[in-house]
Protein backbone atom coordinates (compact mmCIF):
# COMPACT_ATOMS: atom_id res chain seq x y z
CA UNK A 1 0.00 0.00 0.00
CA UNK A 2 1.15 3.56 -0.67
CA UNK A 3 1.76 5.70 2.41
CA UNK A 4 0.57 9.25 1.79
CA UNK A 5 1.84 12.03 4.03
CA UNK A 6 -0.26 15.19 3.93
CA UNK A 7 1.85 18.34 4.11
CA UNK A 8 -0.40 21.15 2.96
CA UNK A 9 -1.39 22.83 6.23
CA UNK A 10 -0.71 26.45 7.08
CA UNK A 11 1.08 25.87 10.42
CA UNK A 12 -0.49 29.08 11.75
CA UNK A 13 -0.48 28.01 15.43
CA UNK A 14 3.14 26.87 15.13
CA UNK A 15 4.46 30.17 13.78
CA UNK A 16 6.37 28.92 10.73
CA UNK A 17 6.63 25.79 8.58
CA UNK A 18 6.37 23.18 11.30
CA UNK A 19 6.93 20.16 9.06
CA UNK A 20 10.45 21.36 8.23
CA UNK A 21 11.22 22.34 11.84
CA UNK A 22 14.19 20.26 12.96
CA UNK A 23 13.86 17.92 15.91
CA UNK A 24 17.05 16.07 16.83
CA UNK A 25 18.57 17.31 13.56
CA UNK A 26 15.76 16.06 11.30
CA UNK A 27 12.67 17.81 9.90
CA UNK A 28 9.49 16.90 11.77
CA UNK A 29 7.93 15.38 8.63
CA UNK A 30 10.92 13.08 8.19
CA UNK A 31 10.31 11.56 11.64
CA UNK A 32 6.75 10.77 10.52
CA UNK A 33 7.86 9.41 7.12
CA UNK A 34 10.56 7.15 8.58
CA UNK A 35 8.12 5.59 11.03
CA UNK A 36 5.49 5.00 8.34
CA UNK A 37 8.16 3.40 6.11
CA UNK A 38 8.95 0.98 8.97
CA UNK A 39 5.45 -0.47 8.59
CA UNK A 40 5.65 -3.76 6.68
CA UNK A 41 2.49 -3.03 4.68
CA UNK A 42 3.76 0.30 3.29
CA UNK A 43 5.67 0.01 0.01
CA UNK A 44 6.50 3.65 -0.65
CA UNK A 45 5.83 7.18 0.56
CA UNK A 46 4.28 10.04 -1.38
CA UNK A 47 3.94 13.56 0.02
CA UNK A 48 0.81 15.54 -0.91
CA UNK A 49 1.29 19.29 -0.56
CA UNK A 50 0.52 22.65 -2.14
CA UNK A 51 2.31 23.95 -5.23
CA UNK A 52 3.97 26.63 -3.08
CA UNK A 53 5.54 24.05 -0.75
CA UNK A 54 6.37 21.44 -3.38
CA UNK A 55 10.06 22.31 -3.86
CA UNK A 56 10.75 22.31 -0.10
CA UNK A 57 9.40 18.78 0.27
CA UNK A 58 10.97 17.42 -2.94
CA UNK A 59 14.36 18.05 -1.30
CA UNK A 60 13.55 15.23 1.14
CA UNK A 61 13.88 12.71 -1.71
CA UNK A 62 10.31 11.39 -1.87
CA UNK A 63 7.68 11.66 -4.60
CA UNK A 64 5.53 14.77 -4.24
CA UNK A 65 2.02 15.28 -5.62
CA UNK A 66 0.38 18.70 -5.67
CA UNK A 67 -3.03 19.18 -4.05
CA UNK A 68 -4.61 21.67 -6.45
CA UNK A 69 -7.89 21.88 -4.52
CA UNK A 70 -6.51 23.56 -1.37
CA UNK A 71 -9.63 22.78 0.67
CA UNK A 72 -8.01 21.08 3.64
CA UNK A 73 -7.67 17.38 4.49
CA UNK A 74 -10.53 16.30 2.21
CA UNK A 75 -8.62 17.79 -0.73
CA UNK A 76 -5.45 15.97 0.31
CA UNK A 77 -7.24 12.63 0.55
CA UNK A 78 -9.00 13.29 -2.77
CA UNK A 79 -5.65 14.06 -4.41
CA UNK A 80 -4.08 10.91 -2.94
CA UNK A 81 -6.77 8.47 -4.04
CA UNK A 82 -7.16 10.09 -7.44
CA UNK A 83 -3.47 9.35 -8.12
CA UNK A 84 -3.06 5.96 -6.44
CA UNK A 85 -5.08 2.88 -5.55
CA UNK A 86 -5.63 2.15 -1.88
CA UNK A 87 -3.64 4.42 0.44
CA UNK A 88 -2.78 4.87 4.08
CA UNK A 89 -2.99 8.59 4.86
CA UNK A 90 -1.22 10.32 7.72
CA UNK A 91 -0.64 13.95 8.63
CA UNK A 92 2.99 15.01 8.39
CA UNK A 93 2.91 16.33 11.96
CA UNK A 94 2.37 12.92 13.64
CA UNK A 95 5.95 11.90 14.52
CA UNK A 96 4.95 9.29 17.11
CA UNK A 97 3.11 7.15 14.57
CA UNK A 98 3.58 3.47 15.38
CA UNK A 99 4.49 1.20 12.42
CA UNK A 100 2.72 -1.81 13.99
CA UNK A 101 -0.45 0.26 14.36
CA UNK A 102 -0.20 1.29 10.68
CA UNK A 103 0.10 -2.38 9.67
CA UNK A 104 -2.85 -3.30 11.90
CA UNK A 105 -5.07 -0.60 10.37
CA UNK A 106 -4.12 -1.75 6.85
CA UNK A 107 -4.96 -5.37 7.80
CA UNK A 108 -8.33 -4.33 9.26
CA UNK A 109 -9.00 -2.28 6.11
CA UNK A 110 -8.41 -5.30 3.85
CA UNK A 111 -10.38 -7.65 6.12
CA UNK A 112 -13.36 -5.28 6.37
CA UNK A 113 -13.68 -4.73 2.61
CA UNK A 114 -14.89 -1.18 3.32
CA UNK A 115 -14.02 2.13 1.65
CA UNK A 116 -12.33 3.52 4.77
CA UNK A 117 -10.85 2.17 7.99
CA UNK A 118 -10.50 4.96 10.55
CA UNK A 119 -9.71 5.27 14.27
CA UNK A 120 -12.64 6.60 16.31
CA UNK A 121 -12.76 7.99 19.85
CA UNK A 122 -15.57 7.08 22.26
CA UNK A 123 -17.01 10.61 21.86
CA UNK A 124 -17.41 9.99 18.11
CA UNK A 125 -14.41 12.06 16.97
CA UNK A 126 -12.59 10.46 14.02
CA UNK A 127 -8.87 10.45 13.20
CA UNK A 128 -9.13 10.71 9.38
CA UNK A 129 -5.45 11.60 9.00
CA UNK A 130 -4.37 8.22 10.34
CA UNK A 131 -6.56 5.99 8.19
CA UNK A 132 -6.71 3.67 5.18
CA UNK A 133 -8.75 4.63 2.11
CA UNK A 134 -9.93 2.73 -0.95
CA UNK A 135 -9.72 4.37 -4.35
CA UNK A 136 -13.44 3.55 -4.59
CA UNK A 137 -14.03 6.26 -1.94
CA UNK A 138 -13.12 8.86 -4.60
CA UNK A 139 -16.66 9.23 -5.97
CA UNK A 140 -18.13 9.89 -2.51
CA UNK A 141 -15.57 12.60 -1.81
CA UNK A 142 -16.02 14.09 -5.26
CA UNK A 143 -19.79 14.42 -4.78
CA UNK A 144 -19.32 16.04 -1.39
CA UNK A 145 -16.73 18.52 -2.71
CA UNK A 146 -19.03 19.42 -5.61
CA UNK A 147 -21.70 20.32 -3.02
CA UNK A 148 -19.19 22.62 -1.29
CA UNK A 149 -18.99 20.37 1.78
CA UNK A 150 -15.39 19.96 2.89
CA UNK A 151 -15.75 17.95 6.11
CA UNK A 152 -13.85 14.71 5.56
CA UNK A 153 -15.53 13.11 8.58
CA UNK A 154 -18.96 13.51 6.99
CA UNK A 155 -17.89 11.62 3.87
CA UNK A 156 -16.25 8.91 5.97
CA UNK A 157 -19.35 8.39 8.13
CA UNK A 158 -21.54 8.16 5.01
CA UNK A 159 -19.33 5.38 3.62
CA UNK A 160 -20.15 2.78 6.35
CA UNK A 161 -16.48 2.57 7.35
CA UNK A 162 -14.53 0.15 9.45
CA UNK A 163 -14.14 1.90 12.83
CA UNK A 164 -11.24 1.21 15.16
CA UNK A 165 -12.10 1.91 18.81
CA UNK A 166 -9.16 3.96 20.04
CA UNK A 167 -9.73 3.45 23.77
CA UNK A 168 -9.33 -0.34 23.34
CA UNK A 169 -5.89 0.02 21.74
CA UNK A 170 -2.51 -0.28 23.49
CA UNK A 171 -1.33 3.08 24.87
CA UNK A 172 1.66 3.28 22.49
CA UNK A 173 -0.75 2.93 19.56
CA UNK A 174 -2.96 5.68 20.98
CA UNK A 175 0.13 7.92 21.14
CA UNK A 176 0.40 7.49 17.35
CA UNK A 177 -2.47 9.94 17.05
CA UNK A 178 -0.62 12.81 18.76
CA UNK A 179 0.08 15.67 16.38
CA UNK A 180 2.16 18.83 16.70
CA UNK A 181 0.17 22.06 16.59
CA UNK A 182 2.33 24.49 18.57
CA UNK A 183 5.97 24.69 19.61
CA UNK A 184 4.90 23.81 23.16
CA UNK A 185 3.90 20.35 21.84
CA UNK A 186 7.55 19.65 20.96
CA UNK A 187 8.43 19.15 24.64
CA UNK A 188 6.05 16.20 24.76
CA UNK A 189 7.79 14.32 21.96
CA UNK A 190 11.51 15.14 22.00
CA UNK A 191 12.39 12.26 24.33
CA UNK A 192 10.35 9.79 22.30
CA UNK A 193 12.15 10.59 19.03
CA UNK A 194 15.54 9.09 18.41
CA UNK A 195 18.38 11.05 16.85
Swiss-Prot record:
GO terms for cellular component: cytoplasm. One of its GO terms (biological process) is Mo-molybdopterin cofactor biosynthetic process. GTP binds at residues 6-8, 18, 67, 93. SUPFAM superfamilies: Nucleotide-diphospho-sugar transferases. Keywords: Cytoplasm, GTP-binding, Magnesium, Metal-binding, Molybdenum cofactor biosynthesis, Nucleotide-binding, Transferase. It comes from the Archaea. It is an enzyme of class 2 (transferase). One of its GO terms (molecular function) is metal ion binding. It holds the Pfam family NTP_transf_3. Its cofactor is Mg(2+). It is found in: Cytoplasm. The keyword Nucleotide-binding applies. Mg(2+) binds at residue 93. Its EC number is 2.7.7.77. It catalyses: Mo-molybdopterin + GTP + H(+) = Mo-molybdopterin guanine dinucleotide + diphosphate. Transfers a GMP moiety from GTP to Mo-molybdopterin (Mo-MPT) cofactor (Moco or molybdenum cofactor) to form Mo-molybdopterin guanine dinucleotide (Mo-MGD) cofactor. The N-terminal domain determines nucleotide recognition and specific binding, while the C-terminal domain determines the specific binding to the target protein. Belongs to the MobA family. HAMAP family: MobA (MF_00316). This is Probable molybdenum cofactor guanylyltransferase. The gene is mobA.
Amino acid sequence: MIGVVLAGGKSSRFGGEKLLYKINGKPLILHTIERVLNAKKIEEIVIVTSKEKMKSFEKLGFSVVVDKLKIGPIGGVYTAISHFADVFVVAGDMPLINPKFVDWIVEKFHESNTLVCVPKWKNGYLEPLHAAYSQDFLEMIKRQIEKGEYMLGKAIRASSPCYIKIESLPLEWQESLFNINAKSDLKKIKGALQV
